[in-house]
Amino acid sequence: MKKLLCAVLSGIMAFSTFAVAVPITASAAESQESVSATYGDFEYEINDSSVAITKYTGSAETVTIPSKIAGYRVAYIDQYAFYACTNLSSIVIPNSVTTIGWGAFSSCTSLSSVIIQRGVINIDGDAFYGCSSLSNITIPDSVTEIYERAFSSCTSLKSVTIPNSVTSIGNAAFSNCVSLSSIVIPNSVKSLGHDAFENCTSLSSVIIMSGVTSIGADAFYGCSSLSNITIPDSVTEIYDGAFSKTKWFDNQSDGVVYAGKVAYTYKGDMPKNTKYC
């Protein structure tokens, strides 16, 4: 009887040990799905085996974002991670990063140098909004979309290189960039969002390569220096006010104004007894 009892107890203990071991392993795996921690001046989260920088707590002027933290690839700069870091003057974004999040560097008013290495795919809305010291930016040819207001109100921005990988430029993406003097829209871009370059008052030359089909409302509204614009035959839609308050429009003769092959608008007074369709 004692032997039988010992055998039963041994079996129960063995089963209990096995039953406890499985949940511990599962729990450890689950805990790795979302882990928050700190690495130097970076707060971060681990999600799906990659790192998102959620906040920068330092005050350095020059920052290089690491490509790996805790053995995981740094893939995402979270929304407002560097918001209003007014001491920050230079940032290097490594090729491990695929997304620069919403407002990530907005209102970094001293930021004058940005190096974005090839790897970034999306530059989200307001990413560099109000970076008033930023004078030039080279966007790598891994980027496919520039979202709304991504570089809006970068008032010192004089030069932008848009690569032949970008397919759309979002609403107000470069609005109020008052120092920007020229821009080339590559043939990979299909659409310019509304207000895309609104109130870029120094913008005097715009070259839109064949491939663009749609120019949004007020896209170049208030670009008071804009006198030279090349519009390809690929453009089939130009929305209201796209070229209002530009030198180019002011120099057009009264009557139907064509932008490329599109009858953009009618300038001046319509003839009497004109019937509208």
PLM feature spans:
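Intrinsic disorder/low-complexity segments enriched in polar/small residues
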Residues: 3, 31-34, 80, 118, ...
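Structural signature of tandem-repeat unit edges
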Residues: 41-49, 58-76, 86-99, 109-122, ...
